[in-house]
Amino acid sequence: MIGLVGRKVGMTRIFTEEGVSIPVTVVEVEVNRVSQVKTVETDGYNAIQVTCGSKKANRVSKPEAGHFAKAGVEAGRGLWEFRLENGEEFTVGAELSVEIFNEIKKVDVTGTSKGKGFQGAIKRWNFATQDMTHGNSLSHRAPGSIGQCQTPGRVFKGKKMAGHMGAERCTTQNLEIVRVDAERNLLLIKGAVPGSTGGNVIVKPAVKA
């Protein structure tokens, strides 16, 4: 099943009737408008392209303006694609709302994680620190050995070392939907989701539910 594109508003908490506090992330899921339907015959695969939100007219390029005009939808802040399974049918200009999650209990949320800049191995990869004393006076937060000797004589690709952390696409799976507020286009999801406040997130039905 397809998902929806939303915007992370922030975190809060709600209480159950028993008085239990549940931390939730509020995701504003504005109406997603179908801007293109892709088929096996024309594109080699089945998918729909959606947009949401709005964009200033002077920020819309001519190719984008023509694309949105052809679909008959308002220019949005971006374009996203969802692959279609056999039997799913949509029309250009159709609108998808948060109500499609009324019968769904668990979702996967994809976003761009917060950028942390250049970080060391301890923060980036959760390495343990070395001794603070006992003869160690220089290498408290150093990673330690990064390889072997003349054989192989190099550092293997993928070695966990210091470097740029965050600002990459990631997915948090199997998050519980606590509430669907169709009137205000809000989705309350238990726990944290990737990204900063105001960032775009993609909410899909959980694949492992």
From Swiss-Prot:
The UniProt record lists the keyword rRNA-binding: yes
- N5-methylglutamine carried by residues: Q150
Alphabetized Gene3D superfamilies for the sequence: 3.30.160.810, Translation factors
KW Ribosomal protein (keyword) present: yes
UniProt KW keywords: Methylation, Ribonucleoprotein, Ribosomal protein, RNA-binding, rRNA-binding
Q: Cite a single GO BP annotation.
A: translation
Q: Which HAMAP family match?
A: Ribosomal_uL3_B
What role does it play?
Answer: One of the primary rRNA binding proteins, it binds directly near the 3'-end of the 23S rRNA, where it nucleates assembly of the 50S subunit.
Q: Which family does it belong to?
A: Belongs to the universal ribosomal protein uL3 family.
Subunit info? Part of the 50S ribosomal subunit. Forms a cluster with proteins L14 and L19.
Which named protein is this? Large ribosomal subunit protein uL3
Which organism was this protein described from? Aliivibrio salmonicida (strain LFI1238)
